[in-house]
C-alpha cells in the first residue's frame, strides 16, 4: 500500500463525515470512513461507524474468484416505524455516499428491498439508488418484498395482478436502466417472502415484456420450476450450539446449486441479532469477533474455484441495523493495539483474534502531518527505527492494524519519540 492510498482512505473518511460534524485530519486516530452517520452510537450487534478496511471483499473468496458481489439495501430509515440511525434513506447525498462506500469495498452492485411504486420514501430511496448507480458505474436491482402485497391481500384483491402491476412498473422504470443487474443480458428480479402468497407465476412471466430472470430464496429455488436462479440468505432459525454460524444452511444451498443449471447467488454475513427490531424473536448468529464473516465468505471455496466460478454472492445486509446484519459501519473484530519505542525499536502488542488483521502500517508524524513509514505483514510485532522510511529527528509514531476487508482498523495511539529518548504513549 502506498502513501497515496493511505491518504486517500483518510480523505474519504473526511468526505463521508463532512455532513455531520467536525472533520478528522490525517492523524493517528479513528476517523469514520464509512457512509454510516457519526450520530449513530452503535448497538449490541452493530459497531459505531469507524475506520473500516477498504481491502476488496473478493480477496476473502477463493483464489481467482470472478464472482459478482452484491449487497442488500434497506430503504426505510427516516421512517418513524424504524430505528433512528442518523440518516434518511431518501437523502440524495446520503445515497451517493453509500454507493461510493460500497464501491470502495469492492462491491459490484446493490439489490434494494422494494415495496412497490406506492411505498413513499422507500420507493424514493430506490429511485435515488438507481440514478446514483448510473452515475457511479455501479449495478442496481430490485427484490420485491412480501410487504408490497400485504395490503392487497388484506383487501382481498388479486395478488397476482398486483405483482404484475409492480413488475411492469419495474420493467419500464428500472430494468431499462444501463445499471440494472443482468445475467446473460436479461434483467434479474428477486423475490423475498412471496412464498406465503398464491401467485400464478406462469401468468407473471407471460405478462412481462423484458422477460426477466426470476430469483427465489434458499436451496428450494433450484427445484422451483418457476425460477431461473436461487440466492442464499441468512438462516438464524437453523443456528444451534453445534452449528452457531448456520453453515449447514450454506452447505445445503451450495450442494443443491452444484447439481442445477440455474444461476446461483451465494451469501456471506457478519452475524444476526434481531433484538433491536420491533418484530424480533430473539434469533442470534453470533459474530464471534469477525469469525462468522470470514467463515461464510470462505465457505464458497468448498464448492467453487477459478475453474468453476460462483456466478454471484450477496451480503445480507448493507444496512439492516435492526436485525444486526449491517456491514455499513464496519465489522468489529474485537482488536486492541498498544505500541511503545524502546532501544531504537518500535514494538507493539495485539489483543484479539490475529486472523482478523491483514497487515500493519507504521505512521510517522511531522508537525501535524502523518505519513506512511512502513507496511508490514500481520505476523510482525516490531521494527527497528532505522528501517523506517521516514526518520525525523523528533517525531511521533503510530501503528495501524489494518483489518481484513470491511473489518475495523485499529490504531495504537501516538508514541512520542525523540532521538535517543523514547516514551510510551
Q: Where do the protein language model's features map onto the residues?
A:
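Bacterial N-terminal signal peptides that target proteins for export
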Residues: 1-6
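Hydrophobic h-region of N-terminal signal peptides that target proteins for export
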Residues: 10-18
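Glycan-processing catalytic domains of CAZymes
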Residues: 23-336, 340-359, 364-367, 372-425
Amino acid at each position: 500500500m502506498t502513501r497515496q492510498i493511505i491518504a486517500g482512505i483518510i480523505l474519504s473518511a473526511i468526505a463521508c463525515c463532512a455532513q455531520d460534524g467536525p472533520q478528522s485530519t490525517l492523524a493517528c486516530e479513528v476517523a469514520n470512513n464509512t457512509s454510516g452517520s457519526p450520530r449513530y452510537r452503535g448497538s449490541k450487534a452493530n459497531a459505531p461507524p469507524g475506520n473500516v478496511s477498504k481491502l476488496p471483499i473478493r480477496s476473502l473468496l477463493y483464489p481467482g474468484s470472478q464472482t459478482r458481489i452484491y449487497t442488500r439495501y434497506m430503504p426505510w430509515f427516516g421512517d418513524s416505524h424504524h430505528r433512528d440511525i442518523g440518516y434518511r434513506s431518501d437523502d440524495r447525498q446520503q445515497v451517493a455516499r453509500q454507493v461510493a462506500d460500497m464501491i470502495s469495498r469492492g462491491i459490484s452492485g446493490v439489490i434494494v428491498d422494494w415495496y412497490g411504486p406506492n411505498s413513499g420514501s422507500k420507493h424514493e430511496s430506490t429511485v435515488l439508488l438507481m440514478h446514483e448507480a448510473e452515475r457511479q458505474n455501479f449495478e442496481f436491482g430490485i427484490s420485491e418484498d412480501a410487504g408490497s402485497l400485504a395490503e392487497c391481500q388484506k383487501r382481498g384483491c388479486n395478488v397476482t395482478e398486483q405483482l404484475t402491476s409492480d413488475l411492469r412498473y419495474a420493467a419500464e422504470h428500472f430494468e431499462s436502466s444501463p445499471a440494472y443487474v443482468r445475467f446473460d443480458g436479461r434483467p434479474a428480479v428477486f423475490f423475498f417472502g412471496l412464498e406465503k402468497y398464491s401467485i400464478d407465476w406462469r401468468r407473471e412471466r407471460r405478462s412481462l415484456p423484458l422477460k426477466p430472470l426470476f430469483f427465489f430464496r434458499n436451496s428450494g429455488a433450484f427445484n422451483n420450476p418457476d425460477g431461473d436462479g436461487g440466492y442464499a440468505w441468512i438462516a438464524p432459525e437453523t443456528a444451534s450450539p453445534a452449528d452457531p454460524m448456520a453453515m449447514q444452511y450454506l452447505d445445503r444451498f451450495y450442494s443443491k446449486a452444484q447439481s442445477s443449471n440455474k444461476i446461483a447467488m451465494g451469501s456471506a454475513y457478519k452475524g444476526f441479532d434481531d433484538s433491536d427490531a420491533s418484530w424480533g424473536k430473539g434469533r442470534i448468529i453470533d459474530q464471534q469477533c469477525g469469525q462468522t464473516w470470514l467463515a461464510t465468505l470462505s465457505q464458497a471455496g468448498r464448492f467453487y474455484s477459478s475453474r468453476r466460478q460462483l456466478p454471484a454472492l450477496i451480503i445480507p445486509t448493507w444496512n439492516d441495523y435492526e436485525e444486526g446484519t449491517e456491514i455499513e459501519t464496519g465489522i468489529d473484530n474485537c482488536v486492541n493495539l498498544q505500541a511503545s519505542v524502546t532501544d531504537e525499536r518500535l514494538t507493539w502488542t495485539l489483543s484479539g483474534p490475529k486472523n482478523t488483521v491483514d497487515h500493519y502500517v507504521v505512521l510517522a508524524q511531522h508537525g501535524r502531518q502523518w505519513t506512511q513509514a512502513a507496511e508490514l505483514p500481520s505476523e510482525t510485532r516490531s521494527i527497528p527505527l532505522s528501517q523506517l522510511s521516514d526518520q525525523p529527528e523528533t517525531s511521533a509514531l503510530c501503528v495501524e492494524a489494518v483489518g481484513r476487508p470491511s473489518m475495523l482498523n485499529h490504531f495504537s495511539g501516538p508514541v512520542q519519540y525523540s532521538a535517543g529518548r523514547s516514551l510510551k504513549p
